[in-house]
Amino acid sequence: MRVNGSAKLVCKTRVKEVSPDGEPILVEPMGNFTVIKDLVTDMDSFWSKMKSIDPYVKTDFEPEAEHIASNESMTHLLGVMNCIMCGACVSECTAMEVDPTFTGPAALAKAYRFVADPRDEETNSRLGDLNKSTGVWDCTRCLACVEVCPKDVAPMER
């Protein structure tokens, strides 16, 4: 939801933080989502975009056991792996206000998670898809997504 004009996790937001002197608090539905009713928004477009980046490790072989990557090769992914899919970044994305077909910061962060995974063998294909219209180049780099992310994923700093 949006609290006083900014996306927040209302389950973790304390009234004292947003209204230290007791001023009125404005609670609104998330931006860039269709409102179903009151504060409820339709997240279908969010999940469709997430699905469109094919969020799975792809290999050309069938591993005989679990395909484990070393800790060293995965530490740079910890930030994007912390994403809780709350949609706060999408709610604040100025590029999505202009073009709702833009892939968006959450899906781009998730895409980075697989592009940078050493076990994934579809990196070139993924990068080709992200290089198309509505992909990474539609981002305006305003960093609004970075400011509101409750888990410090920093989608556009990847």
Each predicted region: which residue ranges?
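Hydrophobic/aromatic-rich structural module bridging two neighboring secondary-structure elements via a short loop
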Residues: M1-G31
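Ferredoxin-type iron-sulfur electron-transfer modules in oxidoreductases and energy-metabolism complexes
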Residues: L26-F33, K37-R158
